[in-house]
Amino acid sequence: MVKWSKTELTIINDIFSHLDYDDIGPKALSRCLIVYPWTQRHFSGFGNLYNAEAIIGNANVAAHGIKVLHGLDRGLKNMDNIVDAYAELSTLHSEKLHVDPDNFKLLSDCITIVLAAKLGKAFTAETQAAFQKFMAVVVSALGKQYH
């Protein structure tokens, strides 16, 4: 079980209370698909992903980015038991979708980068530490089925 300080919980809840899912989600997933092109193999049904412009303008990528970001709400609502909260998604991604678990970390990093760009100076070192701790726990939970 992860121990969360009151400060960490406050920071994480504050981030999500102001999060623009429709902006951050598509940008983060697009960034992941552009920067790490091998991750595109999981999105073959999304249509044209041939270049950065196509990825950024792809409605399926945008919709899935929003869905992924809303998936973090599951962790937010279950801070005391994030592993169990993601057990079903871990199984889905490992057994049915066969997603490389390293991709969760790559997407997590992209979410953090896009969030940092959006928050600017408000994305302090303390904010980053709390957010990345949260993301690391979610990534670990999603990868649990692989262990």
Swiss-Prot record:
Pfam entry (one): Globin
Keyword line: Heme, Iron, Metal-binding, Oxygen transport, Transport
Expression (tissue specificity): Red blood cells.
GO CC terms: blood microparticle; haptoglobin-hemoglobin complex; hemoglobin complex
Residues that hold heme b according to the record: H64, H93
Complex formation: Hb1 is a heterotetramer of two alpha chains and two beta-1 chains.
Identification of the protein by name: Hemoglobin subunit beta-1
The species this protein was found in: Cygnodraco mawsoni (Antarctic dragonfish)
